[in-house]
């Protein structure tokens, strides 16, 4: 695969289904990744069904390679309530899945950063969900153990990709005191 990556914003329900499906395709047959329930994913990501959209907005993106294959996905989320409470201008990224290609992961992160900047945000944090009740975080060890359907599972290369894209070094909320 070459590094010609297009980032496509999701604007339809069909696109949202494709966004959700990518996770299943990426981890198909993986013995430690436990798939999320599709209807839970759809209910969480659908603005008409998730009450968090009363104070959040989101944009979903897919990465497509030069052969029109989907090679990654990411959600950009702005939680206006949290930003107001913490006096921040943060865009969150979540639902971050990608093939092992740094051009893909960095292009997806840039898409969220740019979307956030267009909405007045000045900091990108994640992986996070709409609220602290959603799955969040990144697996950095324990790749040889089964996950649960409530914990993000990711391939070991995710950490290296985030470090390469210069976003992994942000302190976590726990480290901020």
Question: What would you call each of these model-derived segments?
Answer:
Residues 2-48:
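Short amphipathic alpha-helix that is part of the acyltransferase structural core
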Residues 16, 70, 80-83, 132-134:
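Flexible loop/turn segments at secondary-structure boundaries
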Residues 19, 112, 169:
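Aromatic/hydrophobic pocket-lining residues that form π-stacking "cages" and hydrophobic walls in ligand
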Residues 47-62:
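A short helix-loop-beta-strand connector motif used in the catalytic cores of GNAT acetyltransferases and
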Residues 49, 77-81:
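Alpha-helical subdomain
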Residues 62, 69-78:
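Conserved beta-strand in the GNAT
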Residues 83-166:
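Acyl-donor binding region in acyl/amide transferases
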Residues 168-177:
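Single conserved hydrophobic/aromatic residue that forms the stacking wall/gate
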């Amino acid at each position: 695969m070459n590094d010609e990556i297009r980032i496509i914003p999701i604007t339809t329900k069909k696109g949202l289904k494709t966004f959700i499906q990518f996770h299943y395709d990426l981890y198909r047959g993986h013995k430690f990744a436990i798939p999320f329930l599709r209807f839970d994913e759809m209910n969480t990501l659908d603005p008409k069904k998730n009450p968090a959209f009363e104070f959040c907005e989101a944009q979903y993106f897919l990465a497509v390679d030069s052969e029109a294959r989907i090679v990654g996905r990411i959600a950009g989320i702005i939680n206006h309530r949290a930003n107001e409470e913490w006096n921040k201008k943060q865009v969150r990224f979540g639902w971050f899945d990608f093939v092992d290609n740094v051009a893909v992961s960095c292009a997806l992160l840039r898409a969220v950063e740019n979307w956030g900047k267009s909405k007045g945000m000045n900091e990108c944090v994640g992986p996070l969900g709409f609220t602290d009740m959603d799955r969040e975080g990144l697996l950095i060890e324990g790749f040889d153990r089964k996950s649960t359907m409530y914990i993000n599972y990711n391939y070991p290369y995710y950490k290296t990709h985030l470090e390469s894209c210069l976003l992994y070094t942000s302190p976590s909320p726990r480290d901020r005191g």
